[in-house]
Each structure stands twice: as structure tokens, then as C-alpha cells.
Curated annotation (Swiss-Prot):
It is found in: Endoplasmic reticulum lumen. This is Endoplasmic reticulum chaperone BiP. The chaperone activity is regulated by ATP-induced allosteric coupling of the nucleotide-binding (NBD) and substrate-binding (SBD) domains. In the ADP-bound and nucleotide-free (apo) states, the two domains have little interaction. In contrast, in the ATP-bound state the two domains are tightly coupled, which results in drastically accelerated kinetics in both binding and release of polypeptide substrates. J domain-containing co-chaperones stimulate the ATPase activity and are required for efficient substrate recognition. Belongs to the heat shock protein 70 family.
């Protein structure tokens, strides 16, 4: 009776339940359907602090080297007066250009501006983050005008860099990828990551949990008996622990836990805070207000942390750190451990959680896999080994590359690469999915840690007599009441014929695909009427129109980058040529001693003219202008220098014959 006072739309009650869980074979089938003509599929670890790209060819995974010769690329984007920089080049100039250098964008993607984590983060960012419809956007000055970029656009620039690295290695265009995300990313964050891929010109075939990818990398050479594995992934910005079972090439994630807000950067921050406090006390200043000085300290703190993984102490020296004062301090490994002791210990909580969730004891763990650069810290290794009663952690995989390695294997499976036929991957959903029933109760349809893809159905009914409509409200979260969980989406099923409460049979089905994207449908068994929704958190997502605009802008930036690069190369070409000519003409033992004074003067006049032109026009000239000036200079110099060779003036002691170049 009391239920009638509630809105009809909220009334759903449980009648019965059945569920269908697809087996690993279904996953293989899903993979087989995807192996169309998509070219080489790449695997990308889109990290908070660093990103990495791999590719599988002929059964072998290759982690690719970027244009700086590095296997990992900083997840940094910067804007200077002349150009846009991505990766190493962006990070290297961060201290000198803090307000226009964007990093840690993964902390903002798919989140709301009002989210308390976002609010905490933006306090630490030297760049400006503002709200646009409660979505965080980065505000930065580009070529003299204020521009805003969504987290998807910035992430797309990083993904674009990884795509470029892969294309450079493969010598052909790349259009498809597998991208990894932390296990704790919700649907909105996963969708936003896929959108970023689209903006970068990549069709993201799969979003894979990072620990799962690391397990694939680790599990490739494992066969035979079932093994239980803890994957402890402590990266730059996120922390994930997963418990996996691996048996004869089949991976199953039994449970996952973690902290989306714990990693190497937090350890860096402790060093930064410690030394800033020390410096302020010594000099009676507040260095934290100077973004440039803090940028320098950030760079040195990260360096010191890395050094302390192999040495007992290190010295941090920064010339003209603040207000003309130098910075010089020593950091010992013991002090570093003391500064971060509570954070290191905090990493053990999720380890306890995954064991509890999967009902597995410490002694049943066969392997501990360490992933992420922060697992190089000796204290972190010692703590985890101590937790597992002295069991040694596996260190066979480069912790920075394991996730990209696994993503590349999964990419190989999807593109049908040889050597991947026997690999089956079962992933899990990170949070419980359900709907609201009478009284605001969270009724669970897919519990957290269910292997995906999966489909589950349940029969519900009306909560009031003659109720013509039901409202299906879909939530994710672990709390028993929906008000404490996250609303993903809602829709109405209308036109239910008049009937006493509890009589209509409404089947609600949840279908979760391999990327963790959810489709919910409701079907009135009496009338055959059905409605459905694909949960994509539209409120937080980009519209197709926005994505198209961003794709066009990304292409425009790529063209601008190319034009800038060509301009710089052409300018360097002219500068180097003029400089080299001047040096040669002034070298009495070389060219200068072999040409007469008049020719020498002709060349030097032409060089001066080119250098004067450079001084006046370098800032605005195009690549063609520089090439034209170089040709003009060459037209003066070439007839004079070629005269030498025709006269045999290149030197009497040269051998008569040469190999052709």
C-alpha cells in the first residue's frame, strides 16, 4: 500500500532471475570477427606521466623508440610562441614555460570539474583549468590568443605522437589501436579515452585494463598448471592491483582494486614539499608562488627519486633557483623513504582487498609481478615481498613497458597476427552494475569482477496497480542504496497495460561488451514492447559534432607542426650553409687559401647579405623563402668553388681516382 505514494516511474520489484555468462570461447569469436583488413594494430599504454607504444609482428612484440631514441614518451603537451610540442620536447622546456605546458591530463579525462579529486589536482597544476558545463578544460595562450582544449584533445595529441612513432617504424599509416586504462576507470573515462583516439585518427578497437595487459605480457611464456598471480602496478599517477589466474594461455582477472590517485608523482610531490619548506625557512621566502622555480624543483625531484633506486644518496643542485639564490641539498634514500613511508604502506591496502574479494590467501599466490616505474623503488619491493612472507617478486619484464607489451599482444590477436591463435583474454568489469528498485535500493545485475563480455537478465514488475510506465535507472557502485552510487543513465518503458501490481513481467537485460561499454534494455513480456539505452554518459561525453571539429583541429595542428618543422629545417639549412661558407672562406689552410681575394670578397658579401636577410626576416619567412635565399647564396658560391675542382685546385696530394659517392 505504501508503495503507491511513490512515483510509478520508480516502482520496480524483483520477480525472478536468470543469467547467461559467455565463456572464453565467446571472447575468441568476438576477436575473430574483428580481424578484418585493418592493417597493423598497435598497442598503446596511455599513461599519466609516460606513454609507450608496441607492435606485434611475426609473433614478436617490439616496443618502439620515439624520435628522441626513448622507449617511453612523457605524456606532455606544450605550446610555445612558434609551435606545439609533444613528448620529450614538451617536458624538457616545462620549467621555462610552466603555464603553457600540460601534463597529467589523464587525471582530468572523463571527469567532472566539480569532482573533488579534480579540484585537488588543479591546485597543483601550473597551467589553467576552467569549467565548461562542469567539464574541466585547459586554457592556454596559443600564438597570442586564449584557446581552450578538452582533456580528450590533449590526450589525442599524445596518442597522435604514439601513432607517429609507430608509423615511422612501420613505414605505413596506422589506423587501429588497443589502448589501456587503469582498472578503476569508469565508463565515462573509458569512453573519453576512445574519443581521444578518434580525434587522433585512431579507431580504438579495445580498451584494456592496464593490469590485464601487464598479465598478458607476463603470461605469454607460461604454460601448464594454473597459477595465481598478483599484478602490482604502481605508475606515475595511478595504482592498480589485480589478482589473475593463468592457465594454458587463458587469462582470467579474479579481482581488481587500487587507487586512481597514487603513484610516482605523489612521491615526487613529497620531495618537492620537503625542499620547498626547507628553502623557505632558510631564506624567509615563499618559493611555492614561483611556478618556474617549482618546475625546476619538480624536474630535479624526479631525477633524485630515480637515482635513489640505485644509490644511497644524491645531491640536488639548481643554479639561480629563486631570486638569484642557488639551491643545493642532499637527499638520502632513508629520508626519501621516511617522507613517503605512509604512501608506500598505503599500497598494501588494495593488495589485501583483492585477496579478500577473490577469497584467496597469501600462501596461494604463485607469482608477484611488478609493473610501473615506481616499482623500481627498493622500499616498495621490500614491502610487497615482506607482505607475501618473503616471496620474491618477478622482475623479468621492464616495468615501464609491460603494459604496452600486453596491449601490443592484444592488438596482434585482433589483427590476426601469427603466434596469437591460442591466446584467450577474459577481462572483468571493475564496478557493480545495477538498477534502482523501490525504496532507492541498488539491485545488482552484474557484480564487480564479472568476466566480460557478459549478458545478464532479470525479471522485474510494477510496484503499483495500473502502473503504465517504469523508469529504468542504471547505476554503478558498491553501495546498497543508489543515492551513494554513480548514475550512468536512465530511460522509460511506457505503454504497460493496466494490471495489478506485481503482474506485468518486465525483463531487464544488461549487456557488457569487451570494452566495458554497457547496453541496457527493458522488454515488457506481455506486449513485446522494448526500449534500450547504450550507457555512454552522454552528459560528460563529446558530441559527434565536437569530435569532428576536434579531429579537424588535430589535423590542422599536424599540418602546422609539419610546416613549422619544415620552416625550422629550411632556416637551419640556410644558417648552417652561410656559417659553413664563411668559415671555409676564412680558413687560409683550406678553401680560403685556394681562391683569390676578389672571389673571397664576393662570397663573404653574399654570406653577409644572407645573414642580414635572416636577421630581418627569420621570424616571418616561410620554408620556401629560406630555400630561395640558400639557392641565391649557392648560385654565388658554387661557380667559384667548382672552378677549383675543374682546375684541379682541390690539392695536388689527392689520389687520382675516387669511389663515387
Amino acid at each position: 500500500m505504501e508503495h503507491r505514494t511513490r512515483s510509478w516511474a520508480l516502482g520496480l520489484s524483483i520477480l525472478g532471475f536468470f543469467a547467461l555468462l559467455f565463456s572464453a570461447g565467446f571472447v575468441q569469436q568476438a576477436h575473430a570477427n574483428d580481424t578484418e583488413a585493418m592493417g597493423t594494430v598497435i598497442g598503446i599504454d596511455l599513461g599519466t606521466t609516460y606513454s609507450c607504444v608496441g607492435v606485434m609482428q611475426k609473433g614478436k612484440v617490439e616496443i618502439l623508440v620515439n624520435d628522441q631514441g626513448n622507449r617511453i614518451t612523457p605524456s606532455y603537451v606544450a605550446f610555445t610562441d612558434e609551435e606545439r610540442l609533444v613528448g620529450d620536447a614538451a617536458k624538457n622546456q616545462a620549467a621555462a614555460n610552466p603555464h603553457r605546458t600540460i601534463f597529467d591530463i589523464k587525471r582530468l579525462i572523463g571527469r567532472k570539474f566539480s569532482d573533488k579529486d579534480v579540484q585537488n589536482d588543479i591546485k597543483h597544476f601550473p597551467y589553467k583549468v576552467v569549467s565548461k558545463d562542469d567539464k574541466p578544460v585547459v586554457k592556454v595562450e596559443v600564438k597570442g590568443e586564449e584557446k581552450t582544449f578538452t582533456p580528450e584533445e590533449i590526450s589525442a595529441m599524445i596518442l597522435g605522437k604514439m601513432k607517429e612513432t609507430a608509423e615511422g617504424y612501420l613505414g605505413k599509416k596506422v589506423t587501429h589501436a588497443v589502448v589501456t586504462v587503469p582498472a578503476y576507470f569508469n565508463d565515462n573515462q573509458r569512453q573519453a579515452t576512445k574519443d581521444a583516439g578518434m580525434i587522433a585518427g585512431l579507431n580504438v578497437l579495445r580498451i584494456v585494463n592496464e593490469p590485464t595487459a601487464a598479465a598478458i605480457a607476463y603470461g605469454l611464456d607460461k604454460t601448464g598448471e594454473e597459477r595465481q598471480i598478483i599484478v602490482y602496478d604502481l605508475g606515475g599517477g595511478t595504482f592498480d592491483v589485480s589478482l589473475l589466474s593463468i592457465e594454458q594461455g587463458v587469462f582470467e582477472v579474479l579481482s581488481t582494486a587500487g587507487d586512481t590517485h597514487l603513484g610516482g608523482e605523489d612521491f615526487d610531490q613529497r620531495i618537492i614539499n620537503h625542499f620547498a619548506k626547507l628553502f623557505n625557512k632558510k631564506h624567509g621566502v615563499d618559493v611555492t608562488k614561483d611556478a618556474k622555480a617549482m618546475g625546476k624543483l619538480k624536474r630535479e625531484a624526479e631525477k633524485a627519486k630515480r637515482t635513489l633506486s640505485s644509490q644511497m644518496s644524491t645531491r640536488i643542485e639548481i643554479e639561480a633557483f629563486y631570486d638569484g639564490k642557488d639551491f643545493s641539498e642532499t637527499l638520502t634514500r632513508a629520508k626519501f623513504e621516511e617522507l613517503n613511508n605512509d604512501l608506500f604502506k598505503k599500497t598494501l591496502k588494495p593488495v589485501e582487498q583483492v585477496l579478500k574479494d577473490a577469497k584467496v590467501s597469501k600462501s596461494e599466490i604463485d607469482d608477484i609481478v611488478l609493473v610501473g616505474g615506481s616499482t623500481r623503488i627498493p622500499k616498495v619491493q621490500a614491502l610487497i615481498e615482506e607482505f607475501f612472507n618473503g616471496k620474491k617478486a618477478s622482475k623479468g619484464i621492464n616495468p615501464d613497458e609491460a603494459v604496452a607489451f600486453g596491449a601490443a599482444v592484444q592488438a596482434g590477436v585482433l589483427s590476426g597476427e601469427e603466434g596469437t591463435e591460442d591466446i584467450v583474454l577474459m577481462d572483468v568489469n571493475p564496478l557493480t552494475l545495477g538498477i534502482e528498485t523501490t525504496g532507492g535500493v541498488m539491485t545488482k545485475l552484474i557484480p564487480r569482477n564479472t568476466p566480460i563480455p557478459t549478458r545478464k537478465s532479470q525479471i522485474f514488475s510494477t510496484a503499483a496497480d495500473n502502473q503504465p510506465v517504469v523508469l529504468i535507472q542504471v547505476y554503478e557502485g558498491e553501495r546498497s542504496m543508489t543515492k551513494d552510487n554513480n548514475l550512468l543513465g536512465k530511460f522509460e518503458l511506457t505503454g504497460i497495460p493496466p494490471a495489478p501490481r506485481g503482474v506485468p513481467q518486465i525483463e531487464v537485460s544488461f549487456e557488457l561488451d569487451a570494452n566495458g561499454i554497457l547496453k541496457v534494455s527493458a522488454h515488457d513480456k506481455g506486449t513485446g514492447k522494448a526500449e534500450s539505452i547504450t550507457i555512454t554518459n552522454d552528459k560528460g561525453r563529446l558530441t559527434q559534432e565536437e569530435i569532428d571539429r576536434m579531429v579537424a583541429e588535430a589535423e590542422k595542428y599536424a599540418e602546422e607542426d609539419k610546416a613549422t618543422r619544415e620552416r625550422i629545417e629550411a632556416r637551419n639549412g640556410l644558417e648552417n650553409y652561410a656559417f659553413s661558407l664563411k668559415n671555409q672562406v676564412n680558413d687560409e689552410d683550406g678553401l680560403g687559401g685556394k681562391i683569390d681575394e676578389e672571389d673571397k670578397e664576393t662570397i663573404l658579401d653574399a654570406v653577409k647579405e644572407a645573414q642580414d636577410w635572416l636577421e630581418e626576416n627569420a621570424a616571418t619567412a616561410s620554408a620556401e623563402d629560406f630555400d630561395e635565399q640558400k639557392e641565391k647564396l649557392s648560385n654565388v658560391a658554387y661557380p667559384i668553388t667548382s672552378k677549383l675542382y675543374s682546375q684541379g685546385g682541390a690539392g695536388d696530394d689527392e689520389p687520382a681516382g675516387h669511389d663515387e659517392l
